[in-house]
Curated annotation (Swiss-Prot):
Gene3D superfamilies cross-referenced by the UniProt entry: NADP-dependent oxidoreductase domain
Protein name (database record): Aldo-keto reductase FPSE_08125
Single GO MF annotation: aldo-keto reductase (NADPH) activity
Superkingdom of the organism of origin: Eukaryota
Binding site for substrate: 122
Signal peptide: none
Known function: Aldo-keto reductase; part of the Fusarium detoxification of benzoxazolinone cluster involved in the degradation of benzoxazolinones produced by the host plant. Maize, wheat, and rye produce the 2 benzoxazinone phytoanticipins 2,4-dihy-droxy-7-methoxy-1,4-benzoxazin-3-one (DIMBOA) and 2,4-dihydroxy-1,4-benzoxazin-3-one (DIBOA) that, due to their inherent instability once released, spontaneously degrade to the more stable corresponding benzoxazolinones, 6-methoxy-2-benzoxazolinone (MBOA) and 2-benzoxazolinone (BOA), respectively.
EC number(s) per entry: 1.1.1.-
Induction conditions: Expression is induced in response to 2-benzoxasolinone (BOA) exposure. Expression is also induced in response to 6-methoxy-2-benzoxazolinone (MBOA) and 2-aminophenol (2-AP) treatment.
Key words of the record: NADP, Oxidoreductase
Consequence of gene disruption: Shows significantly reduced growth but does not affect tolerance to benzoxazolinone.
InterPro entries, per the entry: Aldo-Keto_reductase, NADP_OxRdtase_dom, NADP_OxRdtase_dom_sf
Length: 327
């Protein structure tokens, strides 16, 4: 079983917590009172590696976390990551300019009420050279406005070049038993080679790898649920992918655990920090208990065989969003 993983000079408890869903993307826009129970449960369980971003809201997600930390006086117990790189308060475009980075860290600090531990560039801007954006991120670190810096959904080539300009501490990208693209595009291998922590978002496949999957058709999603725009969740792809998820559930039954637990434990076994999100305290307890699951070598091989055989159908983002990843 994997209960912690190395991040820089720290040992962080795994899995972490992805806060996006409490105010963004899944048809949720929780008030502080609605969000507080799941954050309290995370704190109680010792799930303290949290992930947010300026664009989740925009600004609302950071503000919710900031209010929680202030109310419960728990800054010293949490590792908080946030992200810039999206003009969230302007036109929503991708921008990595030094001016943007400097301006957005100030807003993040104001909303959180403290400096984040880790600050990412959320999406890579092909119009801004790394020679401008990476020194700007490094300057934040030197100024004490963040301790660590990272990139999100970049290419292996970009990660390598960025790390040659200044030490990159983390790369965040989608990774799960349902989505292993980055094993074949070089990103996982490059991160390992350069000793860069890999933070796996969407470790439950954006909702596929859960018990009691609540959707029978693509029309069942809330009107503002972003999955309505993703090919993987629409048309015939929906039904094909649902059958794949059922196969993983059979594996969980053999292990006498839940599907989310074996999915998260498998990611930890790859040496990656998963950041599953939820709005429900009981689901957070379930997810965090994945750290108690022991995956033996033979079980790891069995799951790997299943992962390699059952490839999902459809792109993982809309056509427009696909243009902003892997750059």
């Amino acid at each position: 079983m994997v209960k912690s993983l190395r991040f820089g000079d720290l040992d962080v408890p795994v899995p972490g917590f992805g806060a996006m869903g409490i105010s963004f993307a899944l048809g949720n826009d929780l008030s502080y009172e609605q969000a507080e129970p799941v954050l309290l449960e995370a704190l109680k369980q010792g799930c303290t590696f949290w992930d947010t971003a300026v664009s989740y809201g925009p600004g609302k997600n950071e503000k919710l976390i900031g209010e929680f930390v202030k109310k419960h006086n728990c800054r010293d117990k949490l590792f908080i990551a946030s992200k810039c790189g999206v003009a969230a308060f302007e036109d929503g475009s991708i921008t990595n300019s030094a001016e943007h980075i400097q301006a957005y860290i100030e807003g993040t600090i104001e909303r959180l009420g403290f400096t984040p531990d880790l600050y990412y560039i959320h999406r890579m801007d092909p119009n801004t050279p790394l020679e401008e954006s990476i020194p700007a991120m490094d300057l934040l670190r030197k100024q004490g406005k963040t301790k660590y810096i990272g990139l999100s959904e970049c290419s292996a080539e970009t990660l390598r070049k960025a790390n040659s300009i200044a030490k990159i501490d983390a790369v965040q990208a989608e990774y799960s038993a349902f989505e292993t693209l980055h094993e074949t595009d070089g990103l996982v291998d490059t991160a390992r080679e350069l000793d860069i922590s890999f933070i796996a978002y969407a470790p439950l496949g954006h909702g596929w790898l859960v018990e009691n999957f609540p959707y029978e058709t693509p029309d069942d999603f809330a009107p503002d649920d972003y999955r309505r725009q993703i090919p993987k969740w629409q048309g015939d792809n929906f039904y094909a992918n649902k059958r794949i998820a059922d196969k993983f559930k059979e594996l969980a039954r053999k292990k006498n655990c839940t599907l989310p637990q074996i999915a998260i434990a498998w990611i930890a076994a790859q040496g990656m920090i998963a950041i599953p999100g939820t709005t429900k305290p009981e689901r957070l307890i379930e997810n965090f208990a994945a750290r108690e699951i022991e995956i033996a070598e033979e079980e790891n091989k069995e799951m790997r065989k299943l992962v390699d055989a059952l490839k999902p159908q459809g792109d993982r983002y809309s056509e427009s969003a696909m243009k902003n990843i892997g750059k």
